[in-house]
Regions:
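S-adenosyl-L-methionine
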Residues: 1-71, 88, 96-117
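Amphipathic alpha-helical interface surfaces
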Residues: 54, 79-82, 102, 106
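Conserved class I S-adenosyl-L-methionine
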Residues: 67-78, 94
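Conserved SAM-binding loop of SAM-dependent methyltransferases across substrates and taxa
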Residues: 79-91
Length: 117
């Protein structure tokens, strides 16, 4: 990769490693190197079925006996899987993600999940 005249030129070898955000019918994805990364809560649905959610280690660790309105802060939200499990267990969850690309992927996953309700 060379920078010239305030533009970045990609050499052929750099193009194979380049990543980009792309939106398609399945939502927003980070695509590059023949792989894609997207938030998708549908794969977590079996884990929140009745009787299974209470056995999730994260939920068990976060529960506070006698707390009727639990609130969790997910300071490393990533794609939101932990937040999803806690919300399904009845927690109010505040999510924070420092990487704007990962935050955008998580926001897209949340928006798509809310559209399925």
């Amino acid at each position: 990769m060379r920078k010239s005249n305030q533009q970045i030129e990609l050499a052929e070898s750099d193009e194979a490693c380049a990543t980009s955000l792309q939106r398609d019918e399945r939502g927003l994805a980070l695509v590059g190197g023949g792989m894609e990364l997207r938030g998708d809560f549908s794969q977590l649905l079996p884990r929140i079925r009745k009787g299974r959610l209470a056995s999730e280690l994260l939920v068990r660790a976060a529960k506070v006996r006698g707390c009727t309105e639990p609130w969790a802060i997910d300071a490393t939200a990533g794609l939101g899987e932990d937040s999803f499990l806690l919300a399904a267990a009845g927690f109010r969850v505040s999510m924070y993600e420092s990487d704007p690309i990962i935050a955008a992927l998580a926001r897209d996953a949340i928006d798509r999940a809310q559209g399925l309700q």
